From Swiss-Prot:
The lineage of its organism: Eukaryota, Viridiplantae, Streptophyta, Embryophyta, Tracheophyta. Interactions between auxin response factors (ARFs) and Aux/IAA proteins occur through their C-terminal dimerization domains III and IV. Residues 1-21, 525-556 are annotated as: Disordered. Residues 526-556 have a biased composition (Low complexity). The keyword DNA-binding applies. Homodimers and heterodimers. Auxin response factors (ARFs) are transcriptional factors that bind specifically to the DNA sequence 5'-TGTCTC-3' found in the auxin-responsive promoter elements (AuxREs). It comes from Oryza sativa subsp. japonica (Rice). Its main location: nucleus. Expressed in roots, culms, leaves and young panicles. The gene is ARF6. Belongs to the ARF family. This is Auxin response factor 6. Residues 134-236 bind DNA.
């Protein structure tokens, strides 16, 4: 069925192709948009839109002057908002009335398409509004048969071709085309007392043919092709009697609801008609516009806003109002709908013509902090570790509620949408890092990597390189990685030939204990058969230059599956008879090379306990020969949101001949080096590294391993293996790793006995970290324009919330700094590297260790701030050498008042 366009019906079948082709041929897009109105913008073909059946019903009610009856059946399967793909848009104009309308072909998205990530690049294609035009509402004299059309002087000089004033009277012939391509001729003359521009001959014919009356509007457009276009807008006059050819109002309501419900259940296409002049509001809007308004704007009762309205002269004007309520327009039939969910009150006395309810995407709140798009050039300097408290020191629920206004909590369809590209913060998407749940495996791998360091050549063992993910090494690190592998290749071959005889002797006894079931990583082993072909294919390409040598090692195929670094435990045992039992317990972990960021199946708490059992079975005699590994050193990473990679600052004992003899027994063949191994991250604030890769000149680290010749040997052998004052548990607050229950994980008793390493060298607790980063309490200067700066002991606080509360109390801004998204007040700080960052971007301890001074930005400074202001702010701090007492001189304050930028939402 095809309904009257004026009624905005729904059709399952589009009009016939000849009819569409004929209308498209005669239609001018610029003229159509001019007749539709300055606020009308059709979505782009191929984009995703949100269709509101509730708004479609309003168009039918406005066209038929009859609201939807209560006896109309309800469609429970039809959601209040339907996300669709826009396949086609066709602009039409009624042949008799010149009423413009658009025909859209929509197709609801499938559940799978709703889950796919969608990154809208625009908020809809802006309609091509004419720039050189004028619009006039006809008066009674303009529509009289004996008169003419009076054109305002300024409009005639702007749109019409210039008159020849040498003639008396000046006159010319004008030819204009309407929407259907019909040409209309008028005589343009400049006469009268006072003189004015008139359209005389041909005007009365045009008025009679179009049946124009007083109140209708006429548009004249001079386009880029030097053509004069003519359009009309009829005044909204509800029809008192509907023609018999048009379906009843109830039938139209039922038809559009049934068509939409059928399309939603079958994911089939359906066609709608949109009449911009008859519809109170747009009911098909771009998805990006909907997401911006609903998920990126926070409103509340009492908030001021402004809204655009069309004027009589086809221009726009902003009207001010106040939000008086937030609720569903029809909670019975359309529950959790965003259509006209905001009750408003208008300021002006003419507000009777305005709607008492509006939609979120129609208004512009005045007190909401700008969040989308963000003009602020700051980014996160350091990666935010998974599981840490959220931005403003509260719970993640508080952060989510401050960043978006989500009313359709019952609508699972919108919860499944991925709007990460629209400004949503990455920590709003909860992620469980499996490697953060298990702490002890990092220690084992750290010990093994340190022991595999070759002392004689000052090169990093490939057993250490296997723990570094190749694609996570940036810039110089990737280049150095390839150079080291090339330099170490001849050494691998030489060591392989030296040890092939010894390995062949051990090869007969190894399968006896290598065939034990892998009970502790069953979830990984279930995936291993799919991973083996890829690993074998990679190894085949790497082993082609050494094909002949590899033929001699066929009897060691079972032993090649054990990673080199983890097999160090068996080689470092002082008693040969303990090797089988040790390797038997280590082998289950040797199959687990990769630690994905979001997979928690391998390193569950049960596996952590099994690792404790493994370490308990490790003999103390073997542990006594292990070299000591001092504190962890960060490794630069490329992805700011990837897991923190453990960097091993390893040193070797003062017995080089013992280590050399042990290294000779290692199987360092390239075939035994996994190429896709990833070292699990060790949580802690010291693992957060600067993305610029800056480091101390005295630190000589390659992939996190100290290659300084002076630090390769430890002077006094292994350090103290036990600290009596250390706790046997890792507190959640100090370790900063993710725990769903926020409980403390007990350390293995083996680690706290005198026979093994002290955990203080691996777990960066608050005590030893503060000794390194901040040896004494630090007072930070806090600045605010127009007031005297205050000194603040930053170490007194434990969260951003406490800091914001205290700063607000000191400067009389109580409640303003805790909610910057609403108040507009922002805190920025200068770190010790002269970078300007938002307070709250970094984890709390990183902020404490790096803050140099803090600046309070007023809403005016926030709005004025831009990239030049950021550069000026940073340059001033660098010139003054981080001396916060002299940081804000009067002259610089005067410059910053015009240059300090707006701190919109931080983009990631």
């Amino acid at each position: 069925m095809k309904l009257s366009p004026s009624a905005g019906g729904v059709s399952d079948q589009p009009p016939s192709p000849p009819e569409v082709a004929e209308e498209q041929k005669c239609l001018n897009s610029e003229l159509w948009h001019a007749c539709a109105g300055p606020l009308v913008s059709l979505p782009a073909v191929g984009s995703r839109v949100v269709y509101f059946p509730q708004g479609h019903s309003e168009q039918v009610a406005a066209s038929t002057n009859k609201e939807m009856e209560s006896q109309i059946p309800n469609y429970p399967n039809l959601p209040p908002q339907l996300i669709c793909q826009l396949h086609n848009v066709t602009m039409h104009a009624d042949a008799e009335t010149d009423e413009v309308y658009a025909q859209m072909t929509l197709q609801p998205l499938s559940p799978q398409e709703l889950k796919d990530p969608f990154l809208p690049a625009e908020l809809g294609t802006a309609s091509k509004q004419p720039t050189n035009y004028f619009c006039k509402t006809l008066t009674a004299s303009d529509t009289s048969t004996h008169g003419g059309f009076s054109v305002p002087r300024r409009a005639a000089e702007k749109v019409f071709p210039p008159l020849d004033f040498t003639q008396q009277p000046p006159a010319q012939e004008l030819m204009a085309k309407d929407l259907h391509g019909n040409e209309w001729k008028f005589r343009h003359i400049f006469r009268g007392q006072p003189k004015r521009h008139l359209l005389t001959t041909g005007w009365s014919v045009f008025v009679s043919a179009k049946r124009l009356v007083a109140g209708d509007s006429v548009l004249f457009i001079w386009n880029d092709s030097n053509q004069l276009l003519l359009g009309i807008r009829r005044a909204n006059r509800p029809q008192t009697v509907m023609p018999s050819s048009v379906l009843s109002s109830d039938s139209m309501h039922i038809g559009l609801l049934a068509a939409a419900a059928h399309a939603a259940s079958t994911n089939s296409r359906f066609t709608i008609f949109y009449n911009p002049r008859a519809s109170p509001s747009e009911f098909v809007i771009p998805l990006a516009k909907y997401v911006k308004a609903v998920y990126h704007t926070r409103i509340s009762v009492g908030m001021r806003f402004r809204m655009l309205f069309e004027t009589e002269e086809s221009s726009v004007r902003r009207y001010m109002g106040t939000i008086t309520g937030i609720s569903d327009l029809d909670p019975v039939r359309w529950m959790n709908s965003h259509w006209r969910s905001v009750k408003v009150g208008w300021d002006e006395s003419t507000a009777g013509e305005r709607q008492p309810r509006v939609s979120l995407w129609e208004i512009e709140p005045l007190t909401t902090f700008p969040m989308y798009p963000s003009p602020f050039p700051l980014r996160l300097k350091r990666p935010w570790p998974t599981g840490l408290p959220s931005l403003y020191g509260g719970k993640e629920d508080d952060l989510a509620s401050s960043l978006m206004w989500l009313r359709d909590s019952q609508n699972t369809g919108f919860q499944s949408l991925n709007f990460g590209g629209l400004g949503m913060s990455p920590w709003m998407q909860p992620r469980l890092d499996s490697s953060l749940l298990g702490l002890q495996p990092d220690m084992y791998q750290t010990i093994a990597a340190a022991a595999a360091l070759q002392n004689t050549t000052k090169q990093v063992s490939p057993a250490m390189l296997q723990f570094q993910q190749p694609q996570n090494i940036v810039g110089r690190s990737s280049l150095l990685s390839s150079q080291i592998l090339q330099q170490a290749q001849p050494q691998f071959q030489q060591m392989y030939h030296q040890n092939i005889n010894g390995n062949s002797i051990q090869g007969h006894s190894q399968p006896e204990y290598l065939q034990q079931p892998l009970q502790h990583c069953q979830s990984f082993n279930e995936q291993k058969p799919q991973l083996q072909p890829q690993q074998q294919q990679q190894e085949s390409h790497q082993q082609q230059p050494q094909h002949q040598q590899m033929q001699q090692q066929k009897h060691l195929s079972n032993f090649q599956t054990v990673p080199n670094a983890l097999s160090v435990f068996s080689q470092l045992s002082s008693t040969p008879q303990s090797t089988p039992s040790t390797l038997q317990t280590v082998s289950p972990f040797s199959q687990q090379h990769n630690f994905p960021d979001t997979n928690i199946s391998c390193l569950s708490p049960s596996n952590v306990s099994s690792m404790h059992d493994t370490l308990r079975s490790f003999p103390s005699e073997a542990a006594s020969d292990l070299p000591g590994v001092p504190r962890i050193t960060p490794v630069p990473v490329s992805d700011p949101w990837s897991s923190k990679r453990v960097a091993v600052e390893s040193t070797i004992t003062s017995r080089p001949h013992d280590i050399s003899s042990q290294i000779e027994n290692f199987d360092l063949t390239p075939s035994s080096i996994p190429q896709n191994s990833t070292l699990a991250p060790l949580p802690g604030r010291e693992c957060l590294v600067d993305q610029d890769g800056s480091s101390d000149p005295q630190n000589h680290f390659l992939f996190g391993v100290n290659i300084d010749s002076q630090s390769l040997l430890m002077q006094d052998g292994i350090p103290s293996l036990h600290n009596e004052n250390s706790s046997s548990t890792i507190p959640y607050s100090t370790s900063n790793f993710l725990s769903p229950s926020q409980d403390d994980y007990p350390l293995s008793q083996t680690l706290t006995t005198p026979g093994c390493l002290d955990e203080s060298g691996y777990v960066p607790c608050s005590d030893n970290a503060d000794q390194v980063k901040r040896p004494h309490a630090t007072f930070v200067k806090v600045y605010k324009s127009g007031t005297v700066g205050r000194l603040l002991d930053i170490t007194r606080f434990s969260s951003y919330h406490e800091l914001r509360s205290e700063v607000g109390r000191l400067f009389g801004l109580e409640g303003q700094l805790e909610d910057p998204l609403r108040s507009g007040w922002q805190l920025v700080f200068v770190d010790r590297e002269d970078d300007v960052l938002l307070v709250g971007d970094d984890p709390w301890q990183e902020f404490v260790n790096s803050v140099s001074c803090i600046k309070i930005l007023s809403p005016q400074e926030v709005q004025q701030m831009g990239k030049p202001g950021i550069e000026l702010f940073s340059t001033s701090a660098r010139r003054l050498g981080n001396s916060c007492d002299n940081y804000m001189s009067r002259q610089e304050s005067r410059s910053l008042s015009t240059g300090i930028a707006s701190v919109g939402s931080v983009e990631f």
